[in-house]
């Protein structure tokens, strides 16, 4: 009986853990969305384009399975909590 109860507890914990999904902000539209299975990190990528001096940096937000490789001229931040990739002063459009 104890073994059966222990087995049920373990199965319950595993099932609850597998069902969890991360939520991250996405760029278009700027709102939190549930990430696809296996993508448990949020990222914020920013860089300058031709309009950087007038509009500021281009910002891309989303979910990822692993943090993208940093490329020259791009800033990348990854985090592992829900909605951790926010951008200050952005409003939903």
Curated annotation (Swiss-Prot):
Residues 1-21 form the signal peptide. Its main location: secreted. Gene3D superfamilies: CD59 (2.10.60.10). One of its GO terms (molecular function) is ion channel regulator activity. Expressed by the venom gland. Disulfide bonds join 24-42, 35-63, 48-52, 67-78, 79-84. It comes from the Eukaryota. Pfam families: Toxin_cobra-type. SUPFAM superfamilies: Snake toxin-like. Keywords: Acetylcholine receptor inhibiting toxin, Disulfide bond, Ion channel impairing toxin, Neurotoxin, Postsynaptic neurotoxin, Secreted, Signal, Toxin. It is found in: Secreted. GO terms for cellular component: extracellular region. Binds with high affinity to muscular (alpha-1/CHRNA1) and neuronal (alpha-7/CHRNA7) nicotinic acetylcholine receptor (nAChR) and inhibits acetylcholine from binding to the receptor, thereby impairing neuromuscular and neuronal transmission. Belongs to the three-finger toxin family. Long-chain subfamily. Type II alpha-neurotoxin sub-subfamily. This is Long neurotoxin 2. It comes from Hydrophis hardwickii (Hardwick's spine-bellied seasnake). The lineage of its organism: Eukaryota, Metazoa, Chordata, Craniata, Vertebrata.
């Amino acid at each position: 009986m104890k073994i059966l109860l222990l087995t049920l507890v373990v199965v319950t914990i595993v099932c609850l853990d597998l069902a969890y999904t991360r939520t991250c902000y996405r760029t278009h539209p700027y709102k939190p969305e549930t990430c696809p299975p296996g993508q448990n990190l949020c990222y914020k990528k920013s860089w300058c384009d031709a309009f950087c001096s007038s509009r500021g940096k281009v910002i891309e937000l989303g979910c990822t399975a692993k943090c993208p490789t940093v490329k020259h001229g791009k800033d990348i931040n990854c985090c592992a909590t829900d909605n951790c990739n926010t951008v200050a002063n952005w409003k939903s459009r």
